[in-house]
C-alpha cells in the first residue's frame, strides 16, 4: 500500500468552473482534519512556464519561494492552506516535453523511438509522484488543467489512467467537476452536459469516483439520482457546488455536502478529527460584516482583466477582514491618467495602489498617480514597478531631475534612477531569468516599514530585472525618501518610504504573494488601516 494517497481533479463542459477552488477547498477540509496535504497543477500548454505569457492571455503569474513562475491557481492553494508551494507544484506540457527531449539528446532512451506513450506519460507519472515521494504529505491533489475532450489534455489523462491502474483503487481517486446549467426558458436544470462530459472522460479509461456539479440553483434529490444513474456513480457521490457569495465560502459548502467524508471513505482513510474551521469562520464573519468601507484606486495597465492582479485583490480581502473594513477596488487604467484629469479619476480614493508591470505603456500615468498621492497625503502603496514609479516621480518633482527615468523605458536617460541589475546585463533569454523567488531584507529600526512588520528581518518574493540606483541614494534620503528595507548581501533597495507622509510605501518585492486567509500580509493590513483613517478624516 502507498504511504501517500493521490486525488485527481478533472473538469468538463467548459473552462473556468473553478477546479482550483474546489481542489483548494477539499485540501483545506482535509488539512483541517489533521492530514498533511499539497496540491499541484498540470497545465496542458507548451510554454515551459507562464513567465513569458501576456497577462491578458493567462492572468497573473504567481511566483513561489523557490522562484518558480507558475499558474495563478497556486496562489489559491497557498491562500487556502497557508503553506508554500514550489516548482514541483506546477507542471506544464512544455516542461514535460523539454525534459523528455533533453533525455533523448543525452542518449537516455538507448536508441528507442521516443513516443507519447510510454515516454511522455511516464514523465507525467514521475512528476505526479515527486511530491508524494518527498515523504511530507499524506495526500497529494493534482488538478488537470483544461477540459476533458481537449487534445492538449489527452497525455495527462492517459497518464492518470495508467497511474490509477498501477496504484490500485484505494490509493487514487478522481473527482470530475462539471456544469449543470439552468435553462431559463425551460425553467429547469439540465443534466445532459454532465452526462456527455462523464462519457468523454470514460472514453479515456477513467471513471470518476465523485462528481462535483457547478450550479446556480440547488440540485433536487431526483436530479441527483438521475445524474448518479446515468453517470454510474453513487448517489452520495454527486456533490452540489452552488454559486457562492465569495470563494472563501466554498470550503464550508463542500463540508456541508460531505465531500471530505466521501473522499476519506473511498480512500479507506480513517478521519483523524472533525475539520477545525473556527478561524476560517471568524475570517468569514469579519469579511461579511464590515464596520466601515474604503475606496482603493488600483492603477495598472491590465485592469480590463482583474485576474492579472489576482493576488493583490485577494490580499485586500484578507486585509479588509482583519480591519473589519470592506475594500472596494476601483480599477484605473494608467493610460487614461494625465496631470489635468487626476482629480476626476483619483479624487474618490482613500488609498492609491500602483500595480506591478513591465514596459513603457501606461508608465507616465502611473507616475502621475504617485504625484497625486504624494501631494495630497493620500495613503500610497507601490509594488515592484509601482515602487520604481514612486522613485522616478520623486526624482523629477522633488530632486529636480526632470529627465529621471528607468533604463527599462529609456536606455539613454541622463539620470537612470532605476537601472538594470548587474546580474541581468548579460542575460539574453527571457524565460525564467529574472530575479525570482524569496530573498532576505533587513528593515531600518524606527522606520515605518519596521513598525509595519514588527521585526528587523523579513523574507519576501521577487520578480524583476531592474533596481533602485544606489548612486542617487544620498540625494533621496536628504530630501525625505528613505530606503528602509535593504538586501543584506547585495544592498539592493527593497523598500522606500516617505518621511513626511502619513503612509507612503514602495516595495520592490511582491507582498501580495504571501498574504493568506489566516495570515494577511502586514503591509496590506496597515495600508487598509491608513486608507480607513484617511476616509474618516474626509468626513
Swiss-Prot record:
Notes on activation and inhibition: Allosterically activated by GTP, when glutamine is the substrate; GTP has no effect on the reaction when ammonia is the substrate. The allosteric effector GTP functions by stabilizing the protein conformation that binds the tetrahedral intermediate(s) formed during glutamine hydrolysis. Inhibited by the product CTP, via allosteric rather than competitive inhibition.
Region: Amidoligase domain, residue numbers: 1-269
Catalytic activity: UTP + L-glutamine + ATP + H2O = CTP + L-glutamate + ADP + phosphate + 2 H(+); L-glutamine + H2O = L-glutamate + NH4(+); UTP + NH4(+) + ATP = CTP + ADP + phosphate + 2 H(+)
InterPro entries to which the protein is assigned, alphabetical: Class_I_gatase-like (IPR029062), CTP_synthase (IPR004468), CTP_synthase_N (IPR017456), GATASE (IPR017926), GATase1_CTP_Synthase (IPR033828), P-loop_NTPase (IPR027417)
EC number: 6.3.4.2
Binding site for ATP: 16-21, 73
NCBIfam families, sorted: PRK05380.1 (NF003792), PyrG (TIGR00337)
General function of this protein: Catalyzes the ATP-dependent amination of UTP to CTP with either L-glutamine or ammonia as the source of nitrogen. Regulates intracellular CTP levels through interactions with the four ribonucleotide triphosphates.
Protein name: CTP synthase
Lineage: Bacteria, Pseudomonadati, Bacteroidota, Cytophagia, Cytophagales
Gene: pyrG
